[in-house]
UniProtKB/Swiss-Prot annotation:
GO terms for cellular component: host cell nucleus; host cell plasma membrane; host multivesicular body; membrane; viral nucleocapsid; virion membrane. Residues 7-31 are annotated as: Interaction with Gp41. The lineage of its organism: Viruses, Riboviria, Pararnavirae, Artverviricota, Revtraviricetes. This is Gag polyprotein. The record marks F135, P136, M365, A366, A382, A383, G431, F432, F445, P446 as: Cleavage. A motif (PTAP/PSAP motif) lies at residues 456-459. A lipid is attached at G2 (N-myristoyl glycine). Pfam families: Gag_p17 (PF00540), Gag_p24 (PF00607), Gag_p24_C (PF19317), zf-CCHC (PF00098). Belongs to the primate lentivirus group gag polyprotein family.
Length: 521
């Protein structure tokens, strides 16, 4: 530990703590960063003592420089730390890591005598105009050469498929990553997809269908002269029966070039669009705003579904103008209708910015509470018809009994006598509905007795009614006799043998038994 601390001593250690990790940042370098750099040097087979001098730091930078473009984050951090330590040994005052890297870069260029510059780690730049950059086919010395796709491009494509799972973003992402690719490179991208093999099979079927259509539209011409390049077939465009050199020659031959890469990309885009519809079954007609959903979130979902729809631009424009307002919730729809005909999206987002949020809900609740607490206005005619308040204690109008200053009336309020209350007053007259309200007469009165000598106007009773009642009584008696138990009948028979008189109806029961069993029974 002591040897590692001896890398920077005294003034150099103080200067190290003044250097910022990032431009305009708050964090600064500490001795722990030097200790970490010494530990990392062991991984590269470099001695820790190299950090103690300016020449040693230069040797470290020469070793690390070729590894920086493709190195890990730890390697880049080690390179930055060594640059700062080199500046401290060279007594160069720097404010942050970026300045230290620039100074170290200038020194290495001057020492090697070349005009090459170290790659900028934190700020990657775009390739100069006129050069291929990341394109698989590049021109060198008048000839077209093939450069394989970088692992970074393939990794970006695989991450796009895994994260979006064939969402609407996959199609434009594939277009951007496969720009300028040959069928060989595009097949590499498709082969890197491990999951979602069902979607890959759909894409293969689309490729086979498009290749068959290409062969039908471009028949094979007659025999070609020796050495002449043949025209591509559907399988050649798909990259199964053609080589990379043939694909490049078809793409850049003069005259009559055939862009096999763009044709193959178009076929795969058709397959990807079908996969997008399969993995996103939500129809744009079903995208509706929830009662508590913000209008901005609803617009995002609407345009995401609209992006997955593979329809004509005119149809998409109609969907935007019609369905966007039609499927909004009632609160936003009320606001949008007040904007007039064909409002812009910016106007709609601005108008519905607070609709559906907590502030709008609180405002509506406050208005509803205010309306509930506000008394309803009484019409003038109804106010004129309302009777004045009358005091039941003194009988005057204009105040109630609670506000009356007169002495409280004693005794019964009905008759004025003491010893009972109005509820028990004998002078009150009540019907079956009780006493009348507020000392008034009851709502019904006992029926008065009819005066003597009046002749009823109802017709006399019909004699057939009496005859019907008589028949009903006889039938009732017969049913009772039939329902008598056998025990009672035998008791009546014993009474007859003993000379006693049985109850009524017993003789008839015995006659029935004689008719069944005869006289000997």
């Amino acid at each position: 530990m002591g040897a590692r601390n001896s890398v920077l001593r005294g003034k150099k250690a103080d200067e190290l703590e003044k250097v910022r990790l990032r431009p305009n940042g708050k964090k600064r370098y500490r001795l722990k960063h030097v200790v970490w750099a010494a530990n990392e040097l062991d991984r590269f087979g470099l001695a820790e003592s190299l950090l103690e001098s300016k020449e040693g730091c230069q040797k470290i930078l020469k070793v690390l420089e070729p590894l920086v473009p493709t190195g890990s984050e730890n390697l880049k951090s080690l390179f930055n730390t060594v640059c700062v330590i080199w500046c401290l040994h060279a007594e160069e005052k720097v404010k942050d890591t970026e300045e230290a890297k620039k100074l170290a870069q200038r020194h290495l260029v001057a020492e090697t005598g070349t005009a090459e510059k170290m790659p900028n780690i934190s700020r990657p730049t775009a390739p100069p105009s006129g050069k291929g950059g990341n394109f698989p086919v590049q021109q060198a010395g008048g000839n077209y050469i093939h450069v394989p796709l970088s692992p970074r491009t393939l990794n970006a494509w695989v991450k796009l498929v895994e994260e979006k799972k064939f969402g609407a973003e996959v199609v434009p992402g594939f277009q951007a990553l496969s720009e300028g690719c040959t069928p060989y490179d595009i097949n590499q991208m498709l082969n890197c997809v491990g999951d979602h093999q069902a979607a890959m099979q759909i894409i293969r079927e689309i490729i086979n269908e498009e290749a068959a259509d290409w062969d039908a539209q471009h028949p094979i011409p007659g025999p070609l002269p020796a050495g002449q390049l043949r025209d591509p077939r559907g399988s050649d465009i798909a990259g199964t029966t053609s080589t990379v050199d043939e694909q490049i020659q078809w793409m850049y031959r003069q005259p009559n070039p055939v862009p096999v890469g763009n044709i193959y990309r178009r076929w795969i885009q058709i397959g990807l669009q079908k996969c997008v519809r399969m993995y996103n079954p939500t129809n744009i007609l079903d995208v509706k705003q929830g009662p508590k959903e913000s209008f901005q979130s609803y617009v995002d979902r609407f345009y995401k579904s609209l992006r997955a729809e593979q329809t004509d631009p005119a149809v998409k424009n109609w969907m935007t103008q019609t369905l966007l307002i039609q499927n909004a919730n009632p609160d936003c729809k009320l606001v949008l209708k007040g904007l007039g005909m064909n409002p812009t999206l910016e106007e709609m987002l601005t108008a519905c910015q607070g609709v559906g949020g907590p502030s709008q809900k609180a405002r509506l609740m406050a208005e509803a509470l205010k309306e509930a607490l506000t008394p309803a206005p009484i019409p003038f005619a109804a106010a004129q018809q309302r009777r004045a308040i009358r005091c039941w204690n003194c009988g005057k109008e204009g105040h109630s009994a609670k506000q009356c200053r007169a002495p409280r009336r004693q005794g019964c309020w009905k008759c004025g006598k003491s010893g009972h209350i109005m509820a028990n007053c004998p002078e009150r007259q009540a019907g079956f509905l009780g006493m009348g309200p507020r000392g008034k007469q009851p709502r019904n009165f006992p029926a008065a007795q009819a005066p003597q000598g009046l002749i009823p106007t109802a017709p006399p009773i019909d004699p057939a009614v009496d005859l019907l009642e008589k028949y009903m009584q006889q039938g009732r008696k017969q049913r009772e006799q039939r329902e008598r138990p056998y025990k009672e009948v035998t008791e009546d028979l014993l009474h007859l043998e003993q000379g006693e008189t049985p109850h009524r109806g017993a003789t008839e029961d015995l006659l029935h038994l004689n008719s069944l069993f005869g006289k000997d029974q």
